[in-house]
């Protein structure tokens, strides 16, 4: 019995000590609990900023319950004088302290963070330096960091460096702690589909999985919005072509309250306005010095020093890039391995400035690879242009060749008699040393469709046997200087393209009459002169050519060009005209009969006074001259070195499609332009471009409204 009582006393003492310990340790435990909960809250706050999945909300709710209990204990526990209540609170504090310590020690939040954490900024490949854009980058960044600035639009032409600039901004966010939780990059492009934009944003936020994939655009927008509204974010949208509705995507609109930022690039200033940007930033082409620095970096010092003439030629090539970074990069990289003067001159050489597209070697090689059925039929297409050939290259299988280009080489003689039953295209132009072509060379080319022998200044004659080629399919035939006789060109009845320009021995009037027999001619470039001085031979009469699409007239000694059929449809297909070095011509009124003309370039014509003469217009047409309104489809008008030019047209024209009216140089008497305040208002922005400030200052505008309309948008051709 005594033993039983002793055991009871011991157990009661232990029980009492435990309870006394709860009460005695209550202040200490409560302080420890408060400290532990602060640590736990710090972890909670850190994770809260980075975790986007809704499952995390349950843990936050549990933590908030713990916090409420602590506050209640702090308020009630110490105030109670009841042993029972003090014991009860003391025990609760001790238990909760262990729970909090257990939560922290188990690393619950670390696991969550590891599973849901996304990088603040997604790093992207980028150039180490941005030649010529440092100032622009600093300006954009400072504006973005300015308090209250929340949405930015960068606009500029394609290839000017907008994407590069935005990539640099993305990089600066990774290097600078601006307090942003996440930076998102989305490439939008022409197909600005809401669904695809949402997908790219969701990947950055960690919103993935089967459940997400099943949601429609509206539900996705809600999920994205619920995540982003709790965060300070940056959204970078690259290459947008139309307004992106942020609300439909689910992106909260940036404001001073949420501190978020949206920045985008576009080619259109109008898009900036539709996105709510009142003062967008224009990304312009590089200044000449910066452009030259970039081009030099791409070409490399070794190439520039490989020949004393190359630096000057390189500057000419760089100038043709007009400060466009994409062109400077691509062409600079292409020319980096060009160490001969010939290769650099080849890069500079141009024929039709407005109708040719430069193609660098990589793109050309890829195009040839594709055209040869991914390399399977590479023997069918032989391109050796501008590589310094002195003789026709050896070909293993002439029978397989369908297209061959040997243009711009050093060929002196073309000999042999290859059998080419499948050859359709042969380009031999611009071989300035070429003096002789064997008559047998063309003998076994029965399917030749395109033959270009133009710009061969040393070639003394056309092979006599070329007319013996058994073909009725020839559709393009070009010849050039000092071929002696052009008679017989009209026998090529299927001829579609004839190039005779820039000849030392130009086409005479009698030979020009044969042109009217070319019923299918579409492209014609010719030099014409008269052998006699009589005025009757100073007039060139064009036949009606309904199919012709392009005409280039060079070194024309005629004083006047007429047409046989004086109706508005006799040149109904003509779209492009170039007039150059035609010192006798005083007007080009015959263009009234080209209703579909889109491009007109007139240059180096010392006597040219009018493009369309009012006096001539009244006499040259069988129709009422007032009914024929010229240049309704004209898109580009370029004038240069026309010292006597006074008028383009005698009254203002609507120019519904004209986008560029360029007066380049040496047109001092052209004071009045055929423009009024309503010209070019049909949807296309009409811009007047000029080469000389003095000319622009002397323009006599139709009225004040016209001056205000066009003067503000005039652009220099050399800036």
UniProtKB/Swiss-Prot annotation:
Domain of life, per lineage: Eukaryota
Functional description taken from the UniProt entry: Probable disease resistance protein.
Coiled coil: 25-73
LRR repeat ranges per the UniProt record: 400-421, 422-444, 447-469
InterPro entries linked: Apaf_helical, LRR_dom_sf, NB-ARC, P-loop_NTPase, Plant_NBS-LRR
Full protein name: Probable disease resistance protein At4g14610
GO biological process, one term: defense response to other organism
Record family assignment: Belongs to the disease resistance NB-LRR family.
Species in which this protein is naturally found: Arabidopsis thaliana
């Amino acid at each position: 019995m005594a033993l039983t009582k002793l055991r009871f006393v011991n157990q009661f003492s232990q029980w009492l000590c435990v309870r006394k310990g709860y009460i005695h340790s209550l202040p200490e435990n409560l302080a420890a609990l408060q400290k532990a909960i602060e640590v736990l809250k710090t972890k909670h706050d850190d994770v809260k900023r980075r975790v986007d999945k809704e499952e995390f909300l349950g843990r936050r709710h549990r933590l908030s319950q713990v916090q409420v209990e602590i506050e209640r204990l702090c308020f009630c526990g110490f105030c109670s004088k009841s042993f029972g209540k003090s014991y009860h609170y003391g025990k609760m504090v001790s238990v909760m302290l262990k729970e909090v310590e257990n939560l922290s020690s188990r690393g619950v939040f670390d696991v969550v963070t590891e599973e849901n954490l996304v990088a603040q900024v997604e790093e992207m490949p980028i150039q180490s330096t941005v030649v010529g854009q440092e100032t622009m980058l600093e300006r954009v960044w400072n504006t973005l960091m300015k308090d209250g600035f929340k949405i930015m639009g960068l606009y500029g032409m394609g290839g000017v460096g907008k994407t590069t600039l935005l990539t640099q901004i993305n990089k600066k966010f990774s290097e600078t702690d601006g307090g942003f939780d996440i930076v998102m990059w989305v490439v939008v492009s022409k197909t600005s589909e809401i669904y695809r934009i949402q997908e790219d944003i969701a990947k950055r936020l960690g919103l993935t999985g089967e459940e997400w994939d099943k949601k429609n655009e509206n539900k996705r927008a809600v999920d994205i919005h619920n995540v982003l509204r709790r965060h300070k974010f940056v959204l970078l949208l690259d290459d947008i072509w139309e307004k992106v509705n942020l609300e439909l995507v689910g992106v909260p609109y940036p404001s001073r309250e949420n501190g978020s930022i949206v920045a985008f690039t576009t080619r259109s200033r109008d898009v900036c306005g539709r996105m709510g940007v009142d003062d967008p930033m224009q990304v312009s082409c590089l200044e000449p010095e910066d452009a030259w620095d970039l081009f030099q970096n791409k070409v490399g010092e070794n190439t520039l020093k490989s020949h004393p003439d190359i630096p000057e030629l390189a500057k000419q090539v760089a100038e043709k890039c007009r400060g466009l970074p994409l062109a400077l990069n691509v062409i600079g990289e292409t020319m980096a391995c060009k160490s001969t003067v010939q290769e650099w001159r080849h890069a500079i050489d141009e024929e039709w400035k407005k109708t040719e597209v430069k193609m660098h070697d990589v793109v050309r090689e890829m195009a040839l690879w594709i055209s040869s059925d991914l390399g399977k039929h590479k023997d069918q297409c032989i391109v050796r242009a501008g590589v310094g050939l002195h003789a026709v290259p050896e070909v293993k299988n002439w029978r397989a060749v369908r297209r061959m280009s040997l243009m711009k080489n050093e060929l002196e003689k073309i000999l042999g008699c290859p059998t080419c039953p499948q050859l359709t295209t042969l380009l031999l132009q611009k071989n300035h040393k070429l003096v002789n072509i064997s008559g047998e060379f063309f003998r076994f080319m029965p399917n030749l469709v395109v033959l270009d022998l133009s710009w061969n200044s040393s070639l003394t004659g056309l092979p006599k046997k070329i007319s013996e080629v058994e073909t009725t399919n020839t559709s393009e035939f070009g010849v050039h200087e000092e071929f002696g006789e052009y008679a017989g060109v009209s026998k090529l009845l299927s001829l579609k393209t004839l190039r005779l320009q820039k000849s030392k021995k130009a086409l005479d009037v009698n030979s020009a009459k044969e042109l009217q027999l070319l019923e299918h001619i579409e492209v014609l470039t010719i030099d014409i002169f008269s052998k006699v001085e009589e005025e009757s031979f100073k007039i060139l009469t064009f036949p009606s050519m309904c199919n012709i699409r392009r005409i280039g007239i060079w070194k024309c000694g005629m004083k006047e060009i007429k047409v046989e059929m004086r109706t508005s449809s006799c040149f109904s297909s003509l779209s492009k005209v170039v007039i150059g070095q035609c010192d006798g011509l005083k007007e080009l009124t015959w263009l009234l009969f080209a209703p579909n003309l889109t491009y007109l370039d007139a240059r180096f014509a010392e006597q040219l006074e009018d493009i369309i003469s009012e006096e001539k217009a009244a006499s040259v047409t069988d129709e009422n001259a007032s009914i024929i309104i010229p240049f309704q489809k004209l898109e580009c008008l370029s004038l240069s070195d026309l010292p006597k030019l006074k008028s383009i047209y005698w009254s203002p024209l609507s120019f519904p499609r004209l986008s560029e009216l360029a007066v380049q140089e040496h047109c001092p008497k052209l004071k009045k332009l055929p423009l009024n305040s309503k010209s070019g208002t049909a949807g296309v922005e009409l811009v007047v471009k000029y080469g000389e400030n003095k000319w622009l200052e002397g323009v006599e505008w139709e009225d004040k409204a016209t001056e205000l309309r066009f003067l503000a948008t005039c652009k220099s051709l050399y800036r």
